[in-house]
Amino acid sequence: MLRKLTLSVSALLCALCLLAQDPTGGVRGTVVSRADRSAVAQASITLSQGSSVISRTTTDQDGNFLFPNLADGMYDLVIEAEEFVSTRVNVTVNDGYVKNMFSLSLTPSQVLAELDASNFAEFDMDDSGYSDNPTILFGQNDVYNSIAGYNFSTVRFRNRGYSAESQDVRLAGVKMNDALSGASPFSLWSGLNEATRTKDSFDGAEVADFGFGGYNGVTNIPVTASYVRKGWRGSVLTNSALYRLRLMMTYASGPLDNGWSYAFSASARLGGNDWIDGVYYRSFAYYASAEKKFNDVHKLSAAFMATPGQRGAQNASTQEVYDLVGDNMYNSNWGYQNGKMRNARVRKTHEPIALLRYDFTPSDDFKAGVTALFRFGKNGYTALDWHDAADPRPDYYRNLPSYFYMEESDYNRNNQFKADWAEDLWTRGYDQDLIHVNWTRLYNVNQNNLDANGRLRSKYVQEERRVDQRDFNLSGNFKWRADRNFTLTGGFDAKINRTENYKILADLLGGDYFLNIDNFAEREYAATAEKLQNDLHYYWDNGSAKSLSKGDKYGYDYYAHVRSADLWAKLDYSYGAFTASAAGTVGAVGFWREGLVRKGLFAGLDENGKEIYASDGTLLTSYDPLTGEAISSYGDSEHKNFLTYGAKGRLEYRIGGNMRVYGNVGYLTEAPTFNKSFLSPRTRNSLVNNLVPVKNFTADINWQLTQGNWNARVSAFYTTIKDQTDVMSYYDDLKNAFTNLALSGIDERHMGIELGFKVPTPVNNLYLQGALSYGEYIYTSNPRMTQTVDNSAELVTLDEIVPYWQSHPVFRKDASGNYVKDAEGNAIFDHNQKHYVPSTPQLAGSIGLAWNYNYWFIDFDFEYFANSYLDMNPVYRTDYAAAGPDNHESAAEIEYMASQEKFNPAHLLNINIGKSWYIQRKYQIGFSFNAKNVLNEKNIKTGGYEQTRLVDNTVSKERYYRFDSKYFYLNGANYMLNVYFRF
């Protein structure tokens, strides 16, 4: 009896103790796709109570999540995932139990999911002396990026006016931006849409969990097997703007019971397009990944991928050429050979990427990972090269009517007969070979050029300019949640890059050999054979220049060495609805050039440090006019080293769990890139004078709403970029020589607003959506210019101010357009006209309707673009270009020479239609059809550049004239149709 009483009292006391404690429970569940009930991995889930954010987590590979240790009460769950519409769920925790939500389904967001992301890769080409990349990746979880990232890319829109180099792009945590140029290399995985579909993106100056980033966002593509959508997927795509056919097949096992995951993908892109002759694709892609999860703590992943292939390039031309042929899509790079199109400029690439990643997760509060990545292979593009022969380009300025006759008599071009004759040849189409590359003529010239030994010495050849990288990277990151309020994140990046830059002889075009000598040097130094040599060591060993065969290296050959390392860390503080972050980074960058051949023009010193002489006694060693040191093309250049650093801060306040206000601020420095640090890396080791790090300041403030079907974001941003450098090489008509030009101290300011929204209308399943980007991106300094002659390093100008780069004066005119002058006869100043960062619309807007019902989607979007400007060259903004031969600057000369061309506004109409069907919840078949530029606008300039040449043989000898600018135009109406099948 006593024993029973004791047990009863003990049980009662235990129960009272339990009742006295605060009951704690939790929430668990599984996130699945509403379409096929498959698990949604890496979904982001935010738990809030009122205006306070309690916790955040992500789903595992099976779609599961858990929020433990929650006090009783009502909570909101916001679930977000790539390619799905965000959703909000209310949940109540009571009696200390863990509430199981079981399956929480997300509706697929299909509007953009099936479109071909390889559009981005097509901007990654410098084949025309013009380079451009988009700087917005698709961002389904941000309404502005989701709309602008697709709709604005048509006109080569740059996010906030920033260059593509400013965007931090990573694979499995490794920064992939090119070591030499900083460019985002989208082409390395173009065609692998399924394998690279999952992305984590952070905007502006925000610091990510996987990298510090810059001022233009950071994106990570996990790329390993467990991130590829489970199952089989095949698709067939055709489009009229890029290539005729794309075939793609992908398989992913998903996580298996034994901890392994596998994924494979392959694709082919083939054919030409409806608009630009000579542009074609013959590209393939492959991907394989395996992953082993040993337990909840250790995971090892490996991946291997590449996109081998080739594509024909487009070239820009002047408006005169486009008007002569009556087609703004004219491409001067191709011609007929034996009845078939042949493009002279073809990009050929095969750059495999191999990576190995280890993830370490000892607890829910700590995780870390490290990735080793190696990029290698070849990257080249072909071009025509010639010696002692006429320029083979069909749109060369001497082939055009304007070369013979101009209405302005001061041009000294007054031969109307020859102009009419040239125009007749272009417009009547008597001989198509005259307006395209005349391959037959090139072969005939070579096959009729016998040397004394009866061999055919080619005057025309096709070269391939190679940039072959060996790029090793090691990156790591960690995240530690110290308690409910503090989280510490950090990591490191290290890179060792060695890139070989050289040319090979791709095609002798019917000849037997081509001589490895410097064509420009032959014009000045023909009497000294050693001066002409591209490879003095070969000449010394053999007594003559090398007779080149197909596949031989020639011209130039050097290594670009780049080393970099950095550390970064971020501390996050969260309390209720308030969060704050502070982050910092420090790093070091070093680079140098290693010449692999000794060039006759810049022989340097011999192994004993002595001067080198030619056999006729001519001194081959030359000296830098600034440093007094011997200029060498062979061996190592000076090693340049830079210390970089940065700091960022962020504040965020959530209002009711559906709305947030946040801001970012950052200051960071960047080392100048290798490609913008050497005056002429093809020929010598000379560096740009006074290289300093680029200094960036950025700030933004944002308001965002995500509530049910209502999505909106408004942002304002301000960024300054200071102390940039740039280099170029061009033919200087005034010096009658090929020259090198370096600019330093280029400053920019970018400021503006962004708006994105998608809101429901009174009509069921119909949404109003739109995006707006309005900014002012201007130059804020007049840089300094140094110019040297390429063949001799002779100094033409040293650190001279380019006075009309930032702006130019505009003078007052009367109603008749005549200049108003003061009492002394001088034109009266009116205002300064700003000069703008080029090649992107500074006003871009989109408004449209989106309808979604029963797995149908239909979108109509109208876009408007304005305030886009032509890329400027510094020569036209100098005093001597504006002054002319008489060295007198008139108001008319300044305004003519220094002004920047503004493109006309443009508008577009785009339509997207798609439908998918699910069969037995196991299979999915669907299609998406996209029509762009439905109104068939063919006069929209998307970019271009000013030529760097001057008309100097004028009648008056008082002024210079510009050469015509060159442009790219938007394709007319085009479509894309994709049919896919999943199981």
Task: Map each language-model feature to its residues.
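Transmembrane beta-barrel wall of Gram-negative outer-membrane proteins
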Residues: 25-26, 238-271, 275-314, 346-365
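Short acidic/polar hinge/loop motifs at secondary-structure boundaries
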Residues: 136-137, 143-147, 174-205, 217, ...
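Acidic/polar loop-and-plug regions of large Gram-negative outer-membrane beta-barrel proteins
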Residues: 291, 299-357, 380-463, 527-552, ...
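Surface-exposed extracellular loop regions of Gram-negative outer-membrane beta-barrel proteins
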Residues: 316-321, 536-547, 590, 601-629, ...
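Outer-membrane beta-barrel signature, preferentially recognizing the C-terminal barrel domain
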Residues: 329-353, 357, 627-642, 646, ...
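Signature of Gram-negative outer-membrane beta-barrel scaffolds
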Residues: 461, 487-656, 681
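Gram-negative outer-membrane beta-barrel transporters
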Residues: 717-720, 741-876, 980
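C-terminal beta-signal and adjacent terminal beta-strands/loops
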Residues: 721-723, 866-889, 915-983
